[in-house]
Amino acid sequence: MTGTLSEKLIARLRARFPNRGLRIHEGKEPVASFPAAHPEVGDIRIDDDGDELAISVAELTHGHFTPRDYQLPSQEKEEDLIERVMRFLEQVFDDQVEFWTAGKAGGWHGRGEKPIGCWPNRRRFVWSGPLPAHEEDS
């Protein structure tokens, strides 16, 4: 990862999650990742896309964390993005975020919250592994 956002993010990831196996990957597409807690969930990967951070959960889904206010000074935007990603990762590692996938569709929401829609053959996961199917999923 390059740039100040990446540098700040990496330092915060190392400090907040010292025992999670953080990996830093340099190269053409620099990235930070955490190894999977369960093979069906896969690794979490964080990409610095310049003015946003993208989080991918293996092949299940991905999402973008963008600045809430693009008019803020760069340092404030970066701090806000990093803190939101830190809170999200804490919730993920605490199994408080539910990931789902159905064919080529996927997403996440807070555990216990109702998903935006219902898809046939939807599979659900938390960081520690798969969740049982609900009646509404069949």
Predicted regions and their residues:
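N-terminal "first-domain core" detector
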Residues: 1-39
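Acidic, proline/glycine-rich low-complexity IDRs
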Residues: 3, 11-15, 76-83, 87-138
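Hydrophobic beta-strand residues in large extracellular and virion-surface proteins
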Residues: 9, 13, 32, 44-46, ...
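Short linear motifs in intrinsically disordered
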Residues: 22-23, 43-47, 96-104
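Generic recognition of long tandem-repeat/solenoid scaffolds
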Residues: 28-37, 53-58, 105-117
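Intrinsically disordered, low-complexity regulatory segments enriched in Ser/Thr/Pro
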Residues: 39-80, 121-138
